[in-house]
């Protein structure tokens, strides 16, 4: 009688699925091939950068400028060697012709050849060093020697970490920035054993960061 008065009806027991929300924590994980550590092979002082964690970067854009006296010295050494190489090549060709006509001794010719080859090796090695700091040896001249060099973004992606500040000297082995290519990004989530049965491959997940909880990202368990 009381059930009727309360307008409550009863029926047979049924097995129903009840939805629930499971909140779990984790961290963003990226395959090694999608992570890039940016360093300066010859070291130097960080002159400028605008990078912050989370910023988007485009491949080829300037992400930092470095400054050091050794950059000037390297450019000077290359241009000096290049100039000496030009005359060494001329002298080598001259001594070669003289030697063929027996107007010059083998010793003089061989010395000219050795000098030319040595300078050619030195020039090539210095040119490769210039490429390491993003200076094109083919366009370098006495008119555009600079104590500053740019660092360019090697990938399209996001800044994961900034490990340096303006004015700091960085060694060749130091990492300035860590970048992420998000094309294969995934979440590494930690789940309690009692909750494992609540999850399944293909299940949809809604993810967000503590810094930006309003920005939700649709994910899927794989």
Where on the chain are the PLM-derived regions?
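Flexible glycine-/small-residue-rich
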Residues: 28-30, 153, 181, 189-193, ...
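Low-complexity, intrinsically disordered
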Residues: 165, 182, 201-218
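Acidic, gly/proline-rich low-complexity N-terminal segments at the extreme N terminus
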Residues: 1-24, 132-153, 207
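Short, intrinsically disordered, charge-balanced linker/junction segments flanking boundaries
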Residues: 1-2, 217-222
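Elongated periplasmic alpha-helical coiled-coil
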Residues: 41, 129-168, 183-185
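Long, amphipathic coiled-coil "stalk"/hairpin helices in large membrane-associated assemblies
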Residues: 3-7, 15-77, 160-165, 172-174, ...
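Alpha-helical hairpins and coiled-coil heptad-repeat segments
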Residues: 65, 69-72, 79-123, 136
């Amino acid at each position: 009688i009381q059930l009727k008065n309360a307008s409550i009806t009863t029926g047979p027991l049924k097995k129903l699925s009840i939805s629930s929300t499971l909140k779990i924590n984790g961290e963003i994980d990226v395959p090694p091939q999608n992570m890039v550590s940016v360093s300066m092979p010859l070291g130097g002082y960080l002159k400028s950068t605008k990078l912050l964690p989370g910023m988007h970067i485009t491949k080829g854009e300037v992400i930092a400028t470095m400054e050091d006296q050794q950059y000037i010295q390297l450019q000077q050494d290359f241009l000096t060697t290049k100039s000496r190489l030009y005359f060494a090549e001329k002298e080598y060709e001259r001594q070669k012709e003289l030697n063929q006509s027996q107007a010059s001794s083998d010793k003089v010719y061989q010395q000219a050849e050795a000098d030319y080859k040595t300078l050619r090796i030195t020039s090539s090695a210095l040119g490769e060093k210039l490429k390491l700091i993003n200076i094109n040896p083919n366009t370098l001249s006495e008119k555009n020697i600079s104590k500053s060099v740019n660092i360019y973004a090697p990938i399209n992606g996001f800044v994961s970490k900034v490990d340096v500040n303006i004015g700091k000297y960085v060694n060749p082995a130091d990492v300035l920035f860590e970048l992420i290519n998000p094309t294969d990004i995934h979440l590494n989530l930690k789940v309690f054993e009692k909750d494992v049965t609540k999850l399944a491959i293909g299940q949809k997940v809604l993810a967000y960061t503590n810094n930006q909880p309003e920005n939700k990202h649709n994910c899927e368990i794989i």
